[in-house]
Design a protein with these regions (language model features):
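A polyanion-binding, active-site-adjacent surface
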Residues: 1-107, 111, 115, 119-122, ...
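C-terminal capping/extension of enzyme domains
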Residues: 83-97, 120-188
């Protein structure tokens, strides 16, 4: 789970994205990213890397964002929200409800990987922890620096699901051993 959609995504609503994916099941946005459609290729490669290091096939993974809003970057979110006559609290609440009642309900995930992990500001990790997480389960496999990695348990639809949190992969390359260690910290 990333944080929010980029300005490259802004031409398509979430509904349009779901319909497009349904109509073209063999076209992968991640694969298109590998082939350069996103400009940079390292984020898409890293999005493939993590499931593989945990024994999953990246083709079977659902990639989504915590906030259902596109913006040029995280700093411009409030401005974009105001443009749509919404508050950040409304976007956050609606996005988390959509994630719990639609995405998680339909996909029944074994594991969630959040790849923006600030706990002091808005991030995929902070939103998941705030809305679904058990803070008493928060454990770090790498507590600081470039490879900060941690995990906690989240309750979605009455299911406990481990959430593994790594730094934003467009800027930071995750360390597989810390990810696997975080999974083990959650008893998986």
């Amino acid at each position: 789970m990333g944080f929010n959609g980029s300005s490259a995504d802004s031409c398509m609503t979430n509904c349009q994205s779901i319909l497009q994916d349904y109509e073209h099941p063999f076209i992968s946005g991640i694969q298109e990213g590998i082939q350069g459609k996103w400009g940079i290729t390292h984020l898409a490669k890293r999005l493939q890397q993590i499931p593989s290091c945990l024994g999953y096939s990246w083709e079977d993974v659902i990639y989504t964002n915590a906030l259902m809003m596109c913006s040029q970057n995280a700093a411009t979110l409030k401005k974009e929200a105001a443009r749509h006559e919404m508050t950040m609290n409304e976007i956050e609440a609606n996005s988390m409800a959509f994630f719990e009642h639609v995405t998680a309900h339909l996909s029944e995930p074994d594991l969630i990987v959040a790849y923006s992990n600030s706990l002091q500001s808005l991030s995929a990790a902070s939103l998941l922890l705030k809305h679904f997480g058990d803070a008493t389960t928060l454990k770090f496999s790498q507590p600081k620096g470039y490879h900060t990695t941690f995990a906690f348990m989240a309750n979605l639809n009455s299911r406990n699901i481990p959430v593994i949190c790594v730094r934003h992969m467009s800027r930071f390359k995750p360390e597989e051993s810390y990810i696997r260690a975080a999974v083990k910290l959650m008893g998986c």
